[in-house]
Amino acid sequence: MLDTNTLNFIYDNKIRLVSKLKNFSKKQIHLYITTVQQDEINKMMDDYKKRCINKIISIIGIRRVLTLSSIKAIDEPSKYEFISSNIGMYELVEDADLPFLAKLQRYTASNPVGNTADLIILYTAIKKKMHYLITDNTSDFEPMLREMSKFISNYLQVQKNYYLDYL
């Protein structure tokens, strides 16, 4: 699973990385993003960057997976997070996981997570037993993983984006 910031890293280094990443599928290594991340890309104001990232996704063969979430709804048109119906973008979480996900979604001083989109992207990677490729900035990611690990066992293998330099 690619962190959204990793897509920006690939975009910034596209000349060097796209051809290398394109060969992953030949080695039976697949890259994924969630439907939430695709929605974030589609909301970008910079049309050139949006088209370029979508083209990179297509060239590399990045696959989209449904996001695991406890919420299915139609958001109001004025709400910034989603611009249309998000039914069909999600799979429901396991009932046993609902209490801790609800707790993690509440931002408090003792709960640094707060970002629901990042939380459900991470949860999706854990439940689908994927590696998670992140940028060098782990300040958002580490507290989230630490908190989530208190409630759900995971075998998430985290790779930082400098791993891409060795391809």
Enumerate the predicted regions with their spans.
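A short acidic, often aromatic-flanked loop/helix-cap motif at beta-alpha or helix-coil junctions
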Residues: 39-41, 68-79, 161-167
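Active-site neighborhoods of divalent-metal-dependent phosphate/nucleic-acid chemistry enzymes
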Residues: 69-132, 138-139
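Alpha-helix capping/helix-boundary segments
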Residues: 6, 37, 120-121, 139-141
